[in-house]
């Protein structure tokens, strides 16, 4: 039986009087990709921080494999434009990094040519590859990617999806990927979890390889890598985030 690296059981998180996450349960397994989808303010970043152990849940339980190695790619990296920082120096800022490990990590993500480039001059796609290389330095069992394609053009997104799939196969690691885009997700995702404070729905994504508009935009390669996840919600959320059942019109907390 495949081991479970991280298990969340009925996790809730409350900040003051505001409940950010409610009754979240999920499991992360080696070699599997779980994509979190949801609008801004849905609690995705909070859930990531719970998984990373940065904040404790207000209720529920979190169990992690002892000694679990995690690689994390943050949503945004803010660097002082006046700070002289090459990719090589940036990589060495990670504690315990050996200089000999830097070039192989960059090579793995096809970014070796960026070794001596200033971080501030990198494109969105190049920046994400460098962050990904840095996350790989500790040979992670779990790779957490927070909005990995934000600020990356369509071609760069396709390339990153290819790379994530390749790393999943090579490392056999679990991947937790976060997105706010409710329409486009990785076709190779094993499970999609739609979040809006609670789990709205979850399941395998649908590959839309025969959709003419999608093929016209991305081509057949894009159809293999991207998919539209069809939401089968039995409810919607009002402007205050409350649940409104579609059939009855009643609300839940």
UniProtKB/Swiss-Prot annotation:
SUPFAM superfamilies per the UniProt record, alphabetical: P-loop containing nucleoside triphosphate hydrolases
GO molecular function: ABC-type zinc transporter activity; ATP binding; ATP hydrolysis activity
GO annotation (BP), single: response to zinc ion
UniProt cross-references to InterPro entries, sorted A to Z: AAA+_ATPase, ABC_transporter-like_ATP-bd, Metal_Ion_Import_ABC, P-loop_NTPase
Principal place of residence: membrane
UniProt xrefs under CDD domains: ABC_Metallic_Cations
Pfam families associated with the record: ABC_tran (PF00005)
Keyword Ligase: no
Annotated disulfide bonds: none
Binding residue positions for ATP: 38-45
Residues of the ABC transporter domain: 6-227
Uppermost EC category: translocase
Nucleotide-binding found in the keyword field: yes
Stored PROSITE patterns: ABC_TRANSPORTER_2, ZNUC
Matching SMART domains: AAA
Record's keyword terms, sorted: ATP-binding, Cell inner membrane, Cell membrane, Ion transport, Membrane, Nucleotide-binding, Translocase, Transport, Zinc, Zinc transport
Catalytic activity: Zn(2+)(out) + ATP(in) + H2O(in) = Zn(2+)(in) + ADP(in) + phosphate(in) + H(+)(in)
Compartments, as annotated in UniProt: Cell inner membrane
Subunit structure: The complex is composed of two ATP-binding proteins (ZnuC), two transmembrane proteins (ZnuB) and a solute-binding protein (ZnuA).
Family: Belongs to the ABC transporter superfamily. Zinc importer (TC 3.A.1.15.5) family.
Functional description taken from the UniProt entry: Part of the ABC transporter complex ZnuABC involved in zinc import. Responsible for energy coupling to the transport system.
Protein name stated in the entry: Zinc import ATP-binding protein ZnuC
Organism: Yersinia pseudotuberculosis serotype I (strain IP32953)
Gene for this chain: znuC
């Amino acid at each position: 039986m495949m081991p479970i690296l991280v298990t969340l059981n009925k996790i809730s998180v409350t900040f003051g009087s505001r409940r950010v996450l409610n009754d979240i349960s999920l499991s992360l397994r080696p070699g599997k990709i779980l994509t979190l989808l949801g609008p801004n303010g849905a609690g995705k970043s909070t859930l990531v921080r719970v998984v990373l152990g940065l904040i404790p849940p207000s209720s529920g339980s979190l169990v992690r494999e002892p000694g679990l190695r995690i690689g994390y790619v943050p949503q945004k990296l803010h660097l002082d434009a006046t700070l002289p920082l090459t990719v090589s120096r940036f990589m060495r800022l990670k504690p315990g990094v050996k200089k000999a490990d830097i070039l192989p990590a960059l090579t793995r993500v096809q970014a070796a040519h960026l070794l001596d480039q200033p971080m501030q001059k990198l494109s969105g796609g190049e920046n994400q590859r460098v962050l990904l290389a840095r996350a790989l330095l500790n040979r992670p069992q779990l790779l957490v990617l927070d909005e990995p394609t934000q600020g990356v053009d369509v071609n760069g997104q396709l390339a990153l999806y290819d790379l994530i799939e390749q790393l999943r196969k090579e490392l056999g690691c679990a991947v937790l990927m976060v997105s706010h885009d409710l329409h486009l997700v990785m076709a190779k995702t094993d499970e999609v979890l739609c979040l809006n404070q609670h789990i709205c729905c979850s399941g395998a994504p649908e590959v839309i390889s025969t959709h003419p508009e999608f093929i016209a935009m991305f081509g057949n390669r894009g159809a293999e890598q991207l998919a539209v996840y069809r939401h089968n919600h039995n409810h919607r959320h009002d402007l205050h985030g409350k649940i409104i059942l579609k059939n009855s019109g009643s609300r839940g907390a």
